[in-house]
Curated annotation (Swiss-Prot):
Function: Part of the ABC transporter complex BtuCDF involved in vitamin B12 import. Involved in the translocation of the substrate across the membrane.
Signal peptide coordinates: none
Protein name: Vitamin B12 import system permease protein BtuC
Principal location: membrane
Annotated source species: Shigella boydii serotype 18 (strain CDC 3083-94 / BS512)
Name of one Pfam family that matches: FecCD
Keywords assigned by UniProt, alphabetized: Cell inner membrane, Cell membrane, Membrane, Transmembrane, Transmembrane helix, Transport
CDD domains associated with the record: TM_ABC_iron-siderophores_like
Protein's cellular compartments: Cell inner membrane
Regions annotated as coiled coil: none
An annotated GO cellular component: plasma membrane
Transmembrane segments: 15-35, 61-81, 88-108, 112-132, 146-166, 184-204, 240-260, 274-294, 302-322
HAMAP family: BtuC (MF_01004)
Self-association and partners: The complex is composed of two ATP-binding proteins (BtuD), two transmembrane proteins (BtuC) and a solute-binding protein (BtuF).
C-alpha cells in the first residue's frame, strides 16, 4: 500500500514537472512568435524592447493568468456541483460580466475608458455571484443551485441579445467580437486586472483539503465535518471574481474551464492537491498555444480565441473520452 502511494506521488510530481515545462515553452514561444519572429538573442535590442517587453509580454501574462483562472474555476465547479459538465459559464457569471459591459457601453455612449469597462464587467459578474449566494443562503441543494445559475445565465444572455439587436452603435457591434474572446487590446494598462487574479488563484490552489471533501459529495462532506454552506459560498464568490476579471481582460472564452480539469482527471490526477496546480499549468499552456494560433492563423486579422479553443480542444476531448472508455 505504501509502495503504491509513493508511486502515485512520484507520478503526480512527474505530471506537474511536465506541465511546468510545457507552460514555460509555450510562454517563450508566445514571446517570440508574431508577425515578426524575435529570437531570444534579440529580446534586448531596441526592436525586442518594443515588441517583446511592451507589446507581447503583457498579452502573454494576461493569457497565462486567464487560462489558469478558467481551468481552476472549472475544477472548483465540477467538485462543488458534482457534475463533470460544470464550467465557469454555467452559473451565468460570464454572461453577467457581459451584461455589465454592454450596460457600460450603452450608458457611456462609447466614451468610457477601458478600465471603466473592466470595472463594469467585474461588477456584472459579482452581481450574479451575489444573487447566487442569496440562493445559497436558502440552503438549496447543489442541483437546485446549479439550475438557478443556468437560469440566470439564460436571462443575461437574453438581455445581451436584445441590447445588441436593437443597437445601432458600432462600438456595441464590435463588442460582440470581444465577447467571443480575444487579447488583442491587452497592454500594461490592464496590469491591475492581472494583479487582481493572482491572490485568488494562489488561495484556491491551497484549498485542496475542502475540495477533496466536496468531491466526495454533500453527504460525505458533512459526515467529515466540512461546513458545507460556508465553503460553497466562499468558492462561488471566488469563482465569480476570477471569471469576472477574466471576462474583463479577454471576453468570454469557452472550453478551457470545461475540458482541462476533465482531461487531467482522465490522466489520473484526481487528488486536488495535484489537480488544482495542474489545472493552472495546463490551462495556462492551452490558452497560450491557442492565442499563438489565433495570432498567426490569418495574415491580416486575428481569430477570436474562443473559436480556436473550441476547434482545437473538442476533438482532443472526444479522443480522450473514447480512449478512456476502452
Amino acid at each position: 500500500m505504501l509502495t503504491l502511494a509513493r508511486q502515485q506521488q512520484r507520478q503526480n510530481i512527474r505530471w506537474l514537472l511536465c506541465l511546468s515545462v510545457l507552460m514555460l515553452l509555450a510562454l517563450l514561444l508566445s514571446l517570440c512568435a508574431g508577425e515578426q519572429w524575435i529570437s531570444l538573442g534579440d529580446w534586448f535590442t531596441p526592436r525586442g524592447e518594443l515588441f517583446v517587453w511592451q507589446i507581447r509580454l503583457p498579452r502573454t501574462l494576461a493569457v497565462l493568468l486567464v487560462g489558469a483562472a478558467l481551468a481552476i474555476s472549472g475544477a472548483v465547479m465540477q467538485a462543488l456541483f458534482e457534475n463533470p459538465l460544470a464550467e465557469p459559464g454555467l452559473l451565468g457569471v460570464s454572461n453577467g460580466a457581459g451584461v455589465g459591459l454592454i450596460a457600460a457601453v450603452l450608458l457611456g455612449q462609447g466614451q468610457l475608458p477601458n478600465w471603466a469597462l473592466g470595472l463594469c464587467a467585474i461588477a456584472g459578474a459579482l452581481i450574479i455571484t451575489l444573487i447566487l449566494l442569496r440562493f445559497a443562503r436558502r440552503h438549496l441543494s447543489t442541483s437546485r443551485l446549479l439550475l438557478a445559475g443556468v437560469a440566470l445565465g439564460i436571462i443575461c444572455s437574453a438581455l445581451m441579445t436584445w441590447a445588441i439587436y436593437f443597437s445601432t452603435s458600432v462600438d456595441l457591434r464590435q463588442l460582440m467580437y470581444w465577447m467571443m474572446g480575444g487579447f488583442g487590446g491587452v497592454d500594461w494598462r490592464q496590469s491591475w486586472l492581472m494583479l487582481a487574479l493572482i491572490p485568488v488563484l494562489l488561495w484556491i490552489c491551497c484549498q485542496s483539503r475542502p475540495m477533496n471533501m466536496l468531491a466526495l459529495g454533500e453527504i460525505s462532506a458533512r459526515q467529515l465535518g466540512l461546513p458545507l454552506w460556508f465553503w460553497r459560498n466562499v468558492l462561488v464568490a471566488a469563482t465569480g471574481w476570477m471569471v469576472g476579471v477574466s471576462v474583463a481582460l479577454a471576453g468570454a472564452i469557452g472550453f478551457i474551464g470545461l475540458v482541462i480539469p476533465h482531461i487531467l482527471r482522465l490522466c489520473g490526477l484526481t487528488d486536488h492537491r495535484v489537480l488544482l496546480p495542474g489545472c493552472a499549468l495546463a490551462g495556462a499552456s492551452a490558452l497560450l498555444l491557442a492565442d499563438i494560433v489565433a495570432r498567426l492563423a490569418l495574415a491580416a486579422a486575428e481569430l477570436p480565441i474562443g473559436v480556436v479553443t473550441a476547434t482545437l480542444g473538442a476533438p482532443v476531448f472526444i479522443w480522450l473520452l473514447l480512449k478512456a472508455r476502452r
